[in-house]
Amino acid sequence: AVLPGLLGGPFNHAIAGVAVGLKEVNTPQFKEYAQQVVKNAQHLANELITKYQFNVVSGGTDKHLVLIDLTNKNVPGRFFSKALDHAGIVSNYNTIPGDLKPPLNPSGLRIGTPWITTRGMKEEQITQIASWMDQVLKICQEDRYQGIKFKDFKIEIKQNIEIQRIAKEVKQLCLQFPLDI
């Protein structure tokens, strides 16, 4: 005899989670959400390219993330990602095609749009986020941060008044778009 709970192994909760997820992605609301995620990423890439002269790998995106080549900005991805983090903007440092730098200190930065789309943000807010990213980058390009060791950079960038100002503005934006948990 086969009884419920004796079949499927110790991961029935994972199987149930997959089932719920598959049901959710089969709705018109999810399709609309997924399309907005891509629109937001495309808008972010376009803003960074056209207004702030960032080099976006492949010239744009057709998915949920933007991969930025920072070689023309003279700021390593690891440093920029940490500065963005202190400003309240989540990103990852990332290698880029043909990167000459090591994986722990690469030339690229990856940023995605699912979280902000989940909050309800659209193109108008993306325009502001791109502006903040450029402001943070300009702070990272200041002479005082050139040639600095990462452990020292982490401390100094956290104390930067402009980074703190941007973090407050980011927080205010997020408060307008609370997570519905």
What is each of the regions a protein language model found here?
Residues 5, 9, 25, 29, ...:
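Short secondary-structure junctions and interdomain/linker hinges
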Residues 39-40, 103-181:
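PLP-dependent enzyme catalytic core of the Aspartate aminotransferase-like
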Residues 4, 24-27, 72, 86-90, ...:
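Short, well-ordered loop/turn and helix-capping segments at boundaries between secondary-structure elements
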Residues 23, 43, 47, 91, ...:
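Short alpha-helical interface elements
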Residues 55-123:
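Conserved PLP-binding catalytic core of the aspartate aminotransferase-like
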Residues 43, 47-52, 79-87, 130-132, ...:
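Generic non-transmembrane alpha-helical segments
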